[in-house]
Amino acid sequence: MADQRNQADKPTTRIPDDEWEAIVANVPLVSVDLVIRHEGGVLLGFRENEPARGEWFVPGGTVFKNETLTDALYRVADEELGVDVTIESRLGTFEHFYDTSDVEGIDSKHYLATAFEVTLDDDNLEMDTQHSQLKVFEPPYEGLHPYVERYLDALD
């Protein structure tokens, strides 16, 4: 299911902080996650922000209104890694429940995350501040965050 960009550079809008707080407090967030096959394993980032701070996790982010899932995936790849990716398959939609949040005064987050298996179009990665390190994990995958393990199970 190789897929290339179909609506690149479509304008999107970020939500103002006060509205974002209300959404996080009351609504599940729609997001995309990138399960990146690379060098015989899967590329993960060491998270510096909530949720999942201090864990090896897949790059990902929320979907903006009027943005397709695939356009969100391409945007996230560019913002978090500085590269283009090719979609190999859609792994499915997964529910994630966290007891932490990046929003002050809100103690949880709920995501409906659609995960995609992707490959990198370029090896020149440029991390953003959400990850302090990038590392390829090879099978057998052990000791990873349970949500990452669910994604890896879906690869097989």
From Swiss-Prot:
It holds the Pfam family NUDIX. A motif (Nudix box) lies at residues 61-82. Pathway: Protein modification; protein glycosylation; Cell surface structure biogenesis; S-layer biogenesis. Mg(2+) binds at residues 60, 80, 130. One of its GO terms (molecular function) is metal ion binding. SUPFAM superfamilies: Nudix. Residues 25-156 form the Nudix hydrolase domain. Signal peptide: none annotated. Keywords: Hydrolase, Magnesium, Metal-binding. Disruption phenotype: Impaired formation of the tetrasaccharide present at 'Asn-532' of S-layer glycoprotein Csg. No effect on 'Asn-47' and 'Asn-117' glycosylation of S-layer glycoprotein Csg. InterPro entries: NUDIX_hydrolase-like_dom_sf (IPR015797), NUDIX_hydrolase_dom (IPR000086). Nudix hydrolase involved in N-glycan biosynthetic pathway that takes place under low-salt conditions (1.75 M instead of 3.4 M). Participates in the formation of the tetrasaccharide present at 'Asn-532' of S-layer glycoprotein Csg, consisting of a sulfated hexose, 2 hexoses and rhamnose. Mediates attachment of sugar 3 in the tetrasaccharide. Belongs to the Nudix hydrolase family. This is Low-salt glycan biosynthesis protein Agl8.
